[in-house]
Amino acid sequence: MEEQTYSLKWNPNPPLGVERLVTYAVAAAVYTIIAWLGVIALPMGFLSVSALYIGMGFLIPFVLWFSGWGWVIGVIGAIVGAGILAGMPVPLAIPFGFVELVVQIPLLIVYRTLGPKFGVSPIGKDVFKPKGFVFFLIVGVVLAQLWSAVTGNFMLYLFGFVPADALPISITAWWIGNMIAVAVIGTILLGVLTPVVERLGLTVRGIIT
């Protein structure tokens, strides 16, 4: 499969079938459970803030593999796993979950547009190579997780769950925890499983299919 087949355009090939829907459903369930466990197992003292949010290490590969479906997986996991199951009221969990899009949409855009220009795989399968790892480290680990920490904590601040004077600590803890999870788990999943996922025809070539 050629790298240039990946873009942000509508691409109905391969068509959406039962096996793909099952794959996305399983991924959503996995991310939801891991998101919930991450929040309750290693809490920071603020609702839905984890000291080590391991779920992000899974979500980044899901977004790079499944494109728009990865966004859906992220929103479901954030609303249900990190939100409702963690004790957040439903009316607040829904907008909290959609904040995930603010992080994951730019990530996919950068990988699908700038990745090939820098000679990097748009689905992250070259993270075990120097160029691919450095690109992933800058885009997926450092910048994306900083943005996640800022936007997520700002939403919790608006909800009244994180006081203003605690924002610097909460943002820093969120950022560091996410970076560790993505750098370790995300790198391994992308490097080991991306060729398999692509070979099975499960990667999404356009924005959604």
Where are these regions (language model features)?
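Short, Lys/Arg-rich, polar N-terminal cytosolic tail immediately upstream
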Residues: M1-G17
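Membrane-embedded alpha-helical hairpins and interfacial helices in multi-pass inner-membrane proteins
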Residues: Q4-Y6, Y24, A28-T32, W36-F62, ...
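Non-catalytic interaction surface on structured domains
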Residues: P12, L16-V30
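Nuclease catalytic cores that cleave nucleic-acid phosphodiester bonds
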Residues: W71-V72
